[in-house]
Amino acid sequence: MDSVLSGKIVQILVGYLKENIYSEQMIKLRMKRICSYEEFLPTYSLIERITEESKEIAIKVYEKNIIVEIVKDFKNKDLIELFELKEELFDEALSYLKKYNADKFLESYTLYCFSEYSDPDSFIKENKSILTKLLRNQYEEVPEEYINELLKSKIKYSTKDLIILDWDNGIILDKNEDFWEEVDIIELACIRVLNLRVFDSMLSEAIQYFTRLQWEKLGYFKLKKLSKDLYLQRISYISYFDSIENVLMLYGDRYYAELYERLCKIFYVSEWIKRVEKKMEMISDIYTMTRQHLTEFYGLLLEGTIVALILLEIILALAKIV
């Protein structure tokens, strides 16, 4: 039978806003170990902070991303109770995304945080059955191979703490309950993969629109307008892609870099980047094709104008003879 656990659960939900939201209250990342590089780190707008008994809710905005972070204490909870609590917090976080009119795209991550233990490795081994089920989000027993793989992938800053990350769940052990730096890194990784997904969808819609066009029926002025629109879209896409890749600049701390890179690997960020780059190349090819169509159309128009002028000169000459 699985053991019961006490600690904190952190439910993170990241969405993409349809319209920008602004707040005068600004907050910075909770990272202490790289304070000398503070100017390079993102700054959030704090939209709401709600404090209740054993629960705190923070709603933040970074550019067009909205982050809902709910932290709740739990005491002597078994697996079923923890899953019920997770579902409850997810639904609550989702209600805030709907309140602020976020888009359909979202990223969710749940952290189970513990501080009552003597040794982090011993705590994991003693509770590995329930912990691995929490990580896999399943009631069934987890294969031993998966458990061993998870234990090998743990990240440690010191001998007193430990973090294990999976697809959409993670476990943090910190005696001082000072896990906010890790929460910030996870939120930024969620922002990165969410924005790549949004960008991928935007590019797909643009490509579908351009491939449905009946190019042979487009006149010169429509082609010219289309060429201009494509050019502006290319600039917009390149700028947006650059902002995604620069969402977090990690300087001077190996632990942060390892944590962030591990998350990017879990989220298949490199594969998303390849998808996006391929579609950006397709947009570039469409732009080149449009310019070629425009050049050919302009050439035909110029030839027609020259022929018309020659005919006009001939007609005028004949008129003088008559």
Curated annotation (Swiss-Prot):
Listed A to Z, the keywords are: Membrane, Transmembrane, Transmembrane helix
Question: Topologically, how does it sit relative to the membrane?
Answer: Single-pass membrane protein
Q: Which domain of life is it from?
A: Archaea
Q: Where in the cell is it found?
A: Membrane
Any one cellular component term from GO for this entry? Answer: membrane
Membrane-spanning residues where?
A: 299-319
Name the record gives this protein: Uncharacterized protein MJ0711
Q: Could you tell me which species this protein originates from?
A: Methanocaldococcus jannaschii (strain ATCC 43067 / DSM 2661 / JAL-1 / JCM 10045 / NBRC 100440) (Methanococcus jannaschii)
